[in-house]
């Protein structure tokens, strides 16, 4: 069958279409994988309300995605909404608009989000190596720890790029650093992982992390380059220092830079650097497979 996943995030809205390989097979083939920046979660950190214009533009993108699904004879479309919709008191206004399009819609917990990211990033891996999968989003960041093909331990923390853009209007990066480490330290799971003697590898998913490769190399986005790339803490720190000292117009000259990411990429890079510092890790492996694949597996296989 041909199935579709729509991931409705705080900053972006993504469409993933794939075809399963027979009724009893666990294999699937990607057909479509696209993203649009919709900023559904703008202002939600403070107001807890989804902005009317943000709702309208996100639903317009979902309408476009539905047409793409129809053009590819998709049998079922399933949408998953994350942090912004979770936090909003007026989430029903958005949910009803999506459901009118004939889409199976779910508002998921941060734990479910983290499990999907872990599954997507590790489902092709074998062996006894443990992984900590990190998914930096606009409203929250998920940390998922465990072995491939097992159910990971997950914590979702309300630290994300859109939140930080809004918070930085009233605080400095020095204050943000303290805030990040306080939020990470509150998690019993993360403190436990931090103190472990066993070896584990960091895997980073989503554009804030994978995009660091192309900022560093000054080349256009190419998932074949970023997937599996070992991103060093020195590269991340260098990217932050460079981005921080650039104007938004200068950031736009970076070949891979999306015009709607020029503001969020700076606090996002800062967050990634602080996460590696927290865990005392020098490298994180980038993965272009993430919660889209994870959701597809759990929904259709």
Predicted regions and their residues:
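N-terminal basic/disordered segments at the start of proteins
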Residues: 1-29
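Short glycine-aspartate micro-motif
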Residues: 3-7, 131-135, 202
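Short beta-strand segments at enzyme active-site cores
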Residues: 76-81
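Conserved ATP-binding subdomain of kinase catalytic cores across diverse folds
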Residues: 25-44, 60-63, 70
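Acidic, divalent-metal-coordinating active-site segment for phosphoryl/phosphodiester hydrolysis
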Residues: 138-145
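Helical "lid/coupling" subdomains associated with nucleotide-phosphate turnover
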Residues: 17, 43-68, 82-95, 99-130, ...
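Structural motif
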Residues: 12-14, 140, 209
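Short acidic/polar active-site loop segments enriched in Thr and Asp
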Residues: 11, 75, 282
């Amino acid at each position: 069958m041909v199935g579709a996943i729509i991931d409705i995030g705080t900053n972006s809205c993504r469409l993933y279409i794939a075809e399963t390989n027979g009724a009893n097979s666990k294999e699937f083939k990607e057909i479509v994988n696209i993203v649009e920046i919709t900023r559904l979660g703008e202002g939600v950190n403070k107001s807890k309300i989804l902005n009317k214009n943000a709702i309208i533009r996100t639903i317009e993108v979902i309408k476009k995605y539905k047409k793409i699904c129809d053009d590819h004879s998709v049998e079922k479309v399933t949408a998953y909404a994350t942090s912004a919709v979770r936090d909003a008191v007026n989430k029903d206004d958005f949910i009803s608009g999506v459901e009118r399009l004939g889409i199976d819609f779910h508002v998921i917990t941060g734990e479910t989000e983290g499990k999907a990211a872990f599954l997507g990033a590790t489902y092709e891996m074998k062996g006894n190596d443990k992984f900590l999968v990190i998914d930096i989003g606009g409203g929250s960041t998920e940390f998922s720890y465990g072995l491939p093909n097992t159910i990971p331990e997950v914590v979702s923390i309300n630290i994300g790029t859109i939140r930080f853009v809004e918070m930085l209007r009233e605080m400095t990066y020095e204050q943000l650093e303290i805030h990040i480490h306080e939020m990470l330290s509150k998690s019993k799971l993360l403190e436990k992982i931090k103190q472990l003697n066993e070896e584990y590898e960091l895997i980073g998913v989503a554009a804030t992390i994978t995009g660091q490769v192309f900022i560093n190399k000054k080349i256009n986005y190419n998932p074949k380059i970023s997937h599996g790339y070992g991103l060093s803490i020195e590269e991340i720190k260098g990217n932050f220092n460079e981005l921080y000292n650039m104007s938004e117009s200068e950031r736009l000259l970076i070949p891979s830079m999306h015009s709607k990411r020029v503001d969020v990429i700076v606090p996002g890079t800062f967050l990634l650097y602080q996460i590696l510092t927290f865990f005392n890790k020098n490298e994180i492996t980038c993965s272009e497979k993430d919660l889209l694949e994870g959701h597809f597996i759990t929904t259709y296989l």
